[in-house]
Amino acid sequence: MNKTSVLMVMVSVVLAGICGCGPEKTPQTGFLSDYSKLQEGANSSLRYINKDALGKYTGFIVDPIAARFLAGTKAVKAKSEGQLSEQDISDLANYLHSAIIKAISDAGYKIEYRSSPGIARIRVAITDLEKTNVALAAVPQARMLTGAGVGGAAMEAEIVDSMTGKQIAAVVETKAGSRVPFTGLSDWGGAKSAMDEWASRLRQRLDEAQSQR
């Protein structure tokens, strides 16, 4: 048996003992103002968007990112084992907040701080975090097979009218870290990759809303 075959066998054995490598259904924490309009999307996500309404807004208030970890989540387990600190959570929340601010600004919208007509509010909660297994994620064969060890994050988010609180869009999603480009060589690289993807999607939705004005 050559070295490549031996490595593949070793990787397969390791992967057999790992849970949660595939898409998971994200639990609902109660953070969103309304879950009733959510519909299933790709990768077990739940989504809702009123495209016509979204296009009417000219600016956004971005609330501080919350953390809502339910019992049994990977984040709770990591906290109990000393693998996830309050500083980690704060740093990741700030990272996501900055990514959202940039997405909004790059799309040509104003960042606002007071409720007023024509302004929407963005609310986001991180609902789970999975630390990157740096040793496993660094093995190319493991990444090719399943994306194992790349870490990730889960969130609930909504856009609501800043005056009425009416929900304009919402999403509930768990996302693994990216394999291309590879993000597995830092403890929270996978979680940040997921957040970057969420911010990128927000930018895309805002661009689409602008084009429909």
Task: List each model region and its residues.
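Short secondary-structure boundary motifs at beta->alpha junctions and helix caps
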Residues: 81-85, 147-148, 163-205
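Extracytoplasmic/secreted envelope proteins and their assembly/folding machinery
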Residues: 93, 97-101, 105, 126, ...
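A structural "domain/chain start" motif
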Residues: 21-94, 204-213
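Short secondary-structure transition/capping segments
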Residues: 59, 152-167, 201-213
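Surface-exposed short loop/turn segments
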Residues: 102, 106-166, 177-184
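Short connector loops/turns at beta-strand edges and beta->alpha or beta->beta junctions
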Residues: 66-72, 129-131, 173-178
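Bacterial N-terminal signal peptides
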Residues: 9-17
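Bacterial N-terminal signal peptides that target proteins for export
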Residues: 1-9
